[in-house]
Amino acid sequence: MTELVARRRGLLALSRREAHRVLKLWTQTVAAPILSSFLFILVFGLSLGGRIKHIDGIDYDVFIVPGLITMAMIQATYANNSASVFQARFDRYLNDVLAAPMRPWEINLALSIGGVVRALLIGAGLLACALAVVDVPIQHPLALTAAVALALVLFSSFGVIVGIYASSWDHTAFVTNIVILPLSFLGGVFYSVDTLPSPWHEISHANPIFYLLNAVRYGFLGTSDVSVGLSLAVSGVLAAAMVAWSSWLFRTGHRLKP
């Protein structure tokens, strides 16, 4: 065990640094996203819950919770990793990491840890806040665990990739505001995609976040707009593709080496 820890000393040190970066600014990185998402539950769930009684037989204020948790977690893990990697490139700190006796997969994994830690803290905190006002069950814990794991792998790797390719802070923010946020809302956070008319119903099935969101909702509530097997399969393929892409970048040094 001691020998294993010694061989992975660089991985552990860089992972601790990324996690500490999140915890040091917890009011901004964790508390603020929890508060903003909890306001969605209060404003949309409790205010509209009196008018929109049920969706798929589930109270509206309960129905929106899994989607809001998913949206908060994927935004957090992407934002954290894209910002961390871009800043490391901008400050030339990443050059020191690349020169360290670490394997490419170790660097890739360590730089992803911060986003995963941040997302898990936000997800747990938001669920705790939601349970204070609504009764949210967990019907399928294994499916929920798999869905959350795939979501974090997918968007933590995606954040690393964008951080490597970005040429300015605007580029990282662009992906959040123009890609992730709209796709999250259009993925069915506040509604069931089955209620949409054609062709919007079919178009929604081309949205990757739609599958993640429905897999998480199935884990919580036992309901989904699409087969949970298909949701996990699509999410797994996308996560594997993002991991392969980010691993290739670190293995080849593309856009990393000065």
Residue ranges and their predicted role:
Residues 1-142, 146-258:
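Hydrophobic transmembrane alpha-helices and immediately adjacent juxtamembrane helices
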